[in-house]
Amino acid sequence: MALDPSEQHLRHVEKDVLIPKIMREKARERCSEQVQDFTKCCKDSGVLMVVKCRKENSALKDCLTSYYKDPAFYEECKMEYLKEREEFRRTGIPTKKRLQKLPTSM
C-alpha cells in the first residue's frame, strides 16, 4: 500500500508522542534562559537544589507550560511534523540523515 506523501491524517502515536516530542524540544529552545538559570542553580546548589532552586524551577515550568497549552504552538509543531513526514515519504530518507553533511572527499 503506497502512502500519499501529502496525506494529512495523523495516527495516535503521531498525535500523542511524536508531535509532543517536537513541542518539548522547541519549548526548551524558546525557554532557554529559564533552562540555563535552572541548570546553573542546580549545579551551584548540589544536594540542596530541591529547596534552593524552587524559584528557577517554577519559572521554567511556567514557561514550558505556556507553550504546551498554546494551540497555535501545537499547530506550528504539527505542521513541522507533517512537512518532515511528507519529505520522508517522498525520499525515504529520515530528516536526521538528510541533514548530515556528506563527506566531500574520500
From Swiss-Prot:
Protein name: COX assembly mitochondrial protein homolog
Alphabetically ordered keywords of this record: Acetylation, Copper, Disulfide bond, Metal-binding, Mitochondrion
Lineage: Eukaryota, Metazoa, Chordata, Craniata, Vertebrata
PANTHER family (UniProt xref): COX ASSEMBLY MITOCHONDRIAL PROTEIN, COX ASSEMBLY MITOCHONDRIAL PROTEIN HOMOLOG
Motif (Cx9C motif 2): 53-63
Localisation per UniProt entry: Mitochondrion
Cystine crosslinks: C31-C63, C41-C53
GO molecular function annotation: metal ion binding
